[in-house]
């Protein structure tokens, strides 16, 4: 990365990070923003909890897998990578050494997931009385439309200019001098979703 400033790579990577976060959390955001009078009910919040954590843990796990995968492949994990793994004949023999070599990644992953769930549960959603349904629904619709616009901007790479469409993996190469540096801009969940 010496030929290009690391800060610039991280800056351009934010567009791809935001896009992946929006894709992974779209259902959670939708359930949280819909103007439903029962969305603060404990049973509904339990559903929202699982809708949030199941896709996020899967996406988070792909990043940890890529920490071990990238040094060997020199590319981000994509759906094509799974096609290669699918045809691997000695995968069972490789799993035990993999677990032994990368035990610290598993430990770190489960520690961070536990911390994430602990912190999530510390935020208590309290039912608030709805004094005026008209104000509640109109403010909810405005929030929904406002956040919907921001989500679309994130998925499109940060704006609504005429050349901006939903970004893809090739867009990362527009921001680098050396094509190998595009991997520093990309993230694994984004690559899996867009490949």
Regions found by a protein language model. Give the residues of each.
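Transmembrane and membrane-interface helices of multi-pass
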Residues: 1-194
């Amino acid at each position: 990365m010496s030929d290009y400033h690391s800060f610039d790579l991280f800056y351009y990577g934010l567009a791809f990070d935001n896009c992946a976060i929006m894709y992974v959390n779209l259902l959670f955001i939708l359930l949280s923003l819909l103007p439903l009078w029962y969305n603060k009910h404990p049973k509904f919040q339990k559903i929202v909890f699982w809708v949030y954590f199941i896709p996020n843990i899967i996406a988070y796990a792909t990043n940890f897998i890529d920490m071990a995968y990238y040094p060997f492949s020199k590319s981000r994990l994509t759906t094509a990578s799974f096609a290669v793994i699918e045809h691997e004949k000695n995968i069972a023999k490789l799993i035990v050494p993999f677990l032994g070599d990368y035990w610290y990644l598993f430990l770190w992953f489960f520690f961070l997931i536990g911390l994430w769930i602990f912190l999530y549960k510390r935020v208590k959603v309290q039912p608030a009385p709805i004094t005026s349904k008209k104000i509640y629904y109109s403010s909810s619709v405005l929030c929904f439309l406002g956040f919907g616009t921001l989500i679309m901007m994130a998925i499109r790479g940060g704006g609504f200019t005429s050349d901006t469409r939903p970004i893809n993996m090739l867009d990362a190469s527009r921001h680098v001098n050396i094509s190998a540096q595009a991997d520093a801009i990309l993230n694994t969940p984004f690559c899996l979703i867009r490949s």
